[in-house]
């Protein structure tokens, strides 16, 4: 199965082309270039977009705009190519990169997105239950390094690849997918613009 996977929910937009579990190519770039990057990866692998069997997309939580960009791109590709889409949690993809690690995404406004008992939650960094010697990954772990480390958590170095939700893990978690219109974003809170007008 030839899968194009991408995630634009965080500051590091990632994309990967995966054939039956083998990574044919991947990039970290900008959300605005995700379709162009995908086309280049497909062509560099000697394929054409019509060869794709599945689109795997990060559904958040993360940046409201980033999640929308990713979902719009996935839905557009699915419609044009008549392929299924699999929505993958950005947190699950981060956790898949480092077995046993706790994913922590910066939610801005002094909050984080993380998994609590397997469920995505938005909370203050101080509300994160930190376990002694457990690894914490993601841009939120980096931003709140002091809070996490002073309570016994372990955070890989700033440049570690573990802090990026690499799309190869979205492909690994994807399964068969389904109709694009059934893939829903995971926001966990209202967008900033909506909150400002409320």
Q: What is each of the regions a protein language model found here?
A:
Residues 1-22, 29-36, 86-198:
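Oxyanion-binding and handling regions
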Residues 54-84:
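DPxDG-like acidic metal-binding loop motif
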Residues 38-54, 129-134:
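Phosphate/pyrophosphate-binding loops at sites that engage ATP/ADP/AMP, CoA/4′-phosphopantetheine
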């Amino acid at each position: 199965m030839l899968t194009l996977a991408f995630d634009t929910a965080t500051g590091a937009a990632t994309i990967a082309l995966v054939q039956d579990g083998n990574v044919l190519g991947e990039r970290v770039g900008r959300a605005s270039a995700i379709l162009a990057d995908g086309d280049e990866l497909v062509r560099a692998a000697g394929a054409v977009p019509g060869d794709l069997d599945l689109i795997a997309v990060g559904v958040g939580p993360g940046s409201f705009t980033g999640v929308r960009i990713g979902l719009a791109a996935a839905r557009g590709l699915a419609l044009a190519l008549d392929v299924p889409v699999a929505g993958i949690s950005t947190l699950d993809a981060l956790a898949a990169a480092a077995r046993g690690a706790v994913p922590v995404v910066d939610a801005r406004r002094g909050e984080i997105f993380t998994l609590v008992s397997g469920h995505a939650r938005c909370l203050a960094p101080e509300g994160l239950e930190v376990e002694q010697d457990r690894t914490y990954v993601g841009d939120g772990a980096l931003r709140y390094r002091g809070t996490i480390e002073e309570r016994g958590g372990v955070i890989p170095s700033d440049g570690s690849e573990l802090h990026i939700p690499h799309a190869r893990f979205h492909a690994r978690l994807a399964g068969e997918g389904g109709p694009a219109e059934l893939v829903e974003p995971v926001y966990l809170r209202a967008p900033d613009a909506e909150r400002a007008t409320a």
